[in-house]
């Protein structure tokens, strides 16, 4: 389990996180929802120790963040971080050299799942297919938790559906997943728990049944309902 306990973070004079507390379990998909700029990505980077927190505590499987935490969690950003001139096969080689947890068999299975070829050059792929490569690079690591920043942002509907299908496949296995998004339409059925953020605080946590009730609503609509009580 990933646990955040009263986490705070300030950038300059702006308080980005104001006592954020929630949990994300293995085998479950937790979604951080909210409009842009409410602290979702900051939370992800804090879990990865890429952004130091000011106060509070973050635990992974009951332990405070340490060097070993990197072996338990992977972060998939919303833009591919590999050199765009690389072929997919070269990106796989890079990952294998850099990460002991790289699983080449799973990488090939994911490549087949998305109908991509190792010889494809990343710079020549569509935005949707680039997002799939980014996803493969994260999912092919043998870790307990996968953090995904806006995996559905700005891609075509077909790519959205393919990526959504991964979450219900054996390729996720029993790993915990945390997703950030500013739009929950079309993915309500994937989520086990949703955490609604605004202005650095958690407005509400939604269970599976409550998430289903948000179908067809925008994040802004959901926020308005919460504020109205």
Could you describe each region identified by the protein language model?
Residues 56-69:
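Conserved ABC transporter NBD signature motif
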Residues 33-35:
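The feature captures the beta-strand-to-loop junction immediately N-terminal to the Walker
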Residues 146-150:
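Catalytic Walker B motif of ABC-type/P-loop ATPase nucleotide-binding domains
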Residues 181-182:
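H-loop/switch region of ABC-family ATPase nucleotide-binding domains
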Residues 79-133:
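ABC-family P-loop ATPase nucleotide-binding domains
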Residues 48:
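Helix-to-loop junction immediately C-terminal to a conserved catalytic motif
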């Amino acid at each position: 389990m990933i646990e955040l306990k009263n986490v705070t973070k300030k950038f300059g004079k702006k308080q980005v996180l104001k006592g954020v507390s929630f949990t994300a379990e293995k085998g479950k998909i937790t979604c951080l929802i909210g409009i842009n700029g409410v602290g979702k990505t900051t939370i992800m980077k804090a879990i990865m120790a890429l952004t130091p927190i000011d106060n509070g505590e973050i635990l992974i499987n009951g332990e405070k963040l340490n060097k070993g935490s990197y072996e338990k969690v992977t972060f998939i950003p919303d833009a591919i971080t590999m050199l765009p001139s690389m072929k997919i096969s070269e990106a796989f080689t890079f990952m294998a050299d850099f990460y002991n947890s790289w699983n080449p068999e799973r990488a090939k299975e994911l490549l087949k799942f998305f109908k991509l070829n190792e010889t494809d050059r990343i710079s020549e792929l569509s935005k949707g297919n680039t997002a799939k490569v980014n996803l493969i690079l994260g999912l092919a690591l043998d870790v307990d938790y996968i953090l995904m920043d806006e995996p559905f942002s700005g891609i075509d509907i077909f790519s959205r559906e393919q990526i959504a299908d991964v979450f219900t496949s054996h390729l996720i296995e029993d790993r915990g997943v945390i997703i950030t998004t500013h739009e929950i339409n079309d993915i309500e059925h994937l989520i086990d728990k949703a955490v609604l953020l605004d202005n650095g605080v958690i407005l509400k946590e939604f269970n599976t049944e409550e998430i289903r009730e948000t179908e067809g609503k925008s994040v802004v609509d959901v926020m308005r309902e919460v504020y109205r009580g």
